[in-house]
């Protein structure tokens, strides 16, 4: 059976057909609508899936935000242009006439990445550092989503009580500092207005402010990982996302994690499925692995 998998992120929408063998084909991408209207997202999703839906028997969605009762509830509305609520499952069922499931994108990615690990690992945490910071937890070989879908939203744990305001309504969240948006927002002077990709490029060219912003992000993530180790006693942490997979970033995180007491050290791995983990994880879940 072929699954039409969809990944809804802060900057892009992706879709692909995934067979029972896990092979990804006919992958497509569109920019996430800047408009905060549900109709704009519906129209973009329609354009994304229309060339693929005739070849699938079901739909699986991995989306940023909290997924509850088939709807997207934005914990940080800024990540979707201000959109607060969207009926994901209902919309895709109407667009495709196919049975549909939905799950948080980082939770889906965690499940895909778990499948790629050695068989003796039963407890792991996945962290995505991209437009925002998200996560997924596998404990005892099972994906933990929580009764309300909130489990794994580790980007909204406290990093600095005097830090910047976060779009979730809290102050000093990891996401507000370590994410691509957080890196860009903190840029000043000639870097003001630059996005995270540009800041990474400038850091590689020796720009001191750009390097400091990236180190600040990596240091914040390392402290989060130490907290995760203390909370879950996980066997490894897998890091993905456009920032998490940027050249040299994970090595910086490892350097800062090594400065923590040994009890909080944990193996760090780059995401095996790179930017396709959310798509693949959603498809695996649709095959009945968990949901």
From Swiss-Prot:
ATP binds at residues 5-12, 132-139. The keyword Kinase applies. Keywords: ATP-binding, Carbohydrate metabolism, Kinase, Metal-binding, Nucleotide-binding, Transferase, Zinc. One of its GO terms (molecular function) is ATP binding. Zn(2+) binds at residues 156, 166, 168, 173. Belongs to the ROK (NagC/XylR) family. NanK subfamily. Homodimer. This is N-acetylmannosamine kinase. It comes from Escherichia coli O1:K1 / APEC. The gene is nanK.
